[in-house]
Amino acid sequence: MADCAAPVGVFDSGVGGLSVLREIRQRLPHESLLYLADSAHVPYGEKSPEYIRERCRVIAAFFVEKGAKALVVACNTATAAGVTELRELYPQLPIIAMEPAVKPAALATRSGVVGVLATTGTLKSAKFAALLDRFAADVRVITQPCPGLVERIEAGDLESADTRAMLMGWVEPMLAQGCDTLILGCTHYPFIRPLLQQLLPNDIRLIDTGAAVARHLREMLAERHLLASGDATQRFYCSGDPQRMARVLPILWGENAVVEFFPS
C-alpha cells in the first residue's frame, strides 16, 4: 500500500510538462511532486516510438525507485508511444496520461473546423487517429506539425518576432479555412497561449488538457485513499543541462528551484 505522503512523479521530454505541473500544484497543493525533464532527448516528437518507449521505461523505473505513488506522463508523444507498456509493467501504479483534446474541441467548435498544433510523433500515432475516429467524425480537423517550436519554448523564447512569425505561418492557413477552435496538442504549447491570444481573433478558442489531467489525478488518488494532507515539496530533475533548466524555471514555473542532474 502506497503512502499518502509519497510523491507524484511527472515527466516530459523537456520543460513543457511544467504546464501540467502548474495545474497539479494549483488543484492539489498538498501533493509532493517529482518532475523530470528528459531534455537530453528532446524533442520526443521527432524520435521513433521504440526510442520513446525506452525513455519511458527508464524514467518510470526512476520514479518507482523514488517511491512515487502515481505517475503522470505529461507528454502527448510519450503517451502515444509508451503509456500502454508502462501500464503493463506497473499494473498497481496509477498512471495518468495526456492526449490531444479532440473531444472537447469537437464539442466546442461552431464552424465545424478544428485545428491541431502538435508534434509529428503525436499526429502520426495510432492513438491520435483513434481519437479522430471516435470524437471528430462530424467535424473537419486540420493538423499542423510544429517542428522547432518545442526547442524555442525550451529556451524560454515565448514571444520573439521569430516565434510570432512561426506561429502565424501555421495558424493563418487554418483560419482561412474556417477554423474557430485550436487544440494545443503538446504540453509545451500552453506556454505560448498568451502569444496566440495576441495573434488570433478573440473568438478563436484555445484548448489544452492540463487542467483535465490534474482533475483526473485527483480522482485517481481519492479513489485509492492516497490524497496527501501535509506540506508539499517539489524536486526537479533534468537529463540535459540542469543550469539551463534552472534559468527558465522562473519563466515557466514561476519561481526559482534547484535542478538535479538525471544521468541517462
UniProtKB/Swiss-Prot annotation:
<dbReference type="InterPro" id="IPR015942">
    <property type="entry name" value="Asp/Glu/hydantoin_racemase"/>
</dbReference>
<protein>
    <recommendedName>
        <fullName>Glutamate racemase</fullName>
        <ecNumber>5.1.1.3</ecNumber>
    </recommendedName>
</protein>
<dbReference type="InterPro" id="IPR004391">
    <property type="entry name" value="Glu_race"/>
</dbReference>
<dbReference type="GO" id="GO:0009252">
    <property type="term" value="P:peptidoglycan biosynthetic process"/>
</dbReference>
<dbReference type="InterPro" id="IPR033134">
    <property type="entry name" value="Asp/Glu_racemase_AS_2"/>
</dbReference>
<feature type="binding site">
    <location>
        <begin position="76"/>
        <end position="77"/>
    </location>
    <ligand>
        <name>substrate</name>
    </ligand>
</feature>
<dbReference type="GO" id="GO:0008360">
    <property type="term" value="P:regulation of cell shape"/>
</dbReference>
<keyword id="KW-0961">Cell wall biogenesis/degradation</keyword>
<dbReference type="InterPro" id="IPR018187">
    <property type="entry name" value="Asp/Glu_racemase_AS_1"/>
</dbReference>
<dbReference type="GO" id="GO:0008881">
    <property type="term" value="F:glutamate racemase activity"/>
</dbReference>
<feature type="binding site">
    <location>
        <begin position="12"/>
        <end position="13"/>
    </location>
    <ligand>
        <name>substrate</name>
    </ligand>
</feature>
<feature type="binding site">
    <location>
        <begin position="44"/>
        <end position="45"/>
    </location>
    <ligand>
        <name>substrate</name>
    </ligand>
</feature>
<comment type="pathway">
    <text>Cell wall biogenesis; peptidoglycan biosynthesis.</text>
</comment>
<keyword id="KW-0133">Cell shape</keyword>
<dbReference type="Pfam" id="PF01177">
    <property type="entry name" value="Asp_Glu_race"/>
</dbReference>
<comment type="function">
    <text>Provides the (R)-glutamate required for cell wall biosynthesis.</text>
</comment>
<feature type="active site" description="Proton donor/acceptor">
    <location>
        <position position="186"/>
    </location>
</feature>
<keyword id="KW-0573">Peptidoglycan synthesis</keyword>
<keyword id="KW-0413">Isomerase</keyword>
<dbReference type="GO" id="GO:0071555">
    <property type="term" value="P:cell wall organization"/>
</dbReference>
<comment type="similarity">
    <text>Belongs to the aspartate/glutamate racemases family.</text>
</comment>
<feature type="active site" description="Proton donor/acceptor">
    <location>
        <position position="75"/>
    </location>
</feature>
<dbReference type="InterPro" id="IPR001920">
    <property type="entry name" value="Asp/Glu_race"/>
</dbReference>
<feature type="binding site">
    <location>
        <begin position="187"/>
        <end position="188"/>
    </location>
    <ligand>
        <name>substrate</name>
    </ligand>
</feature>
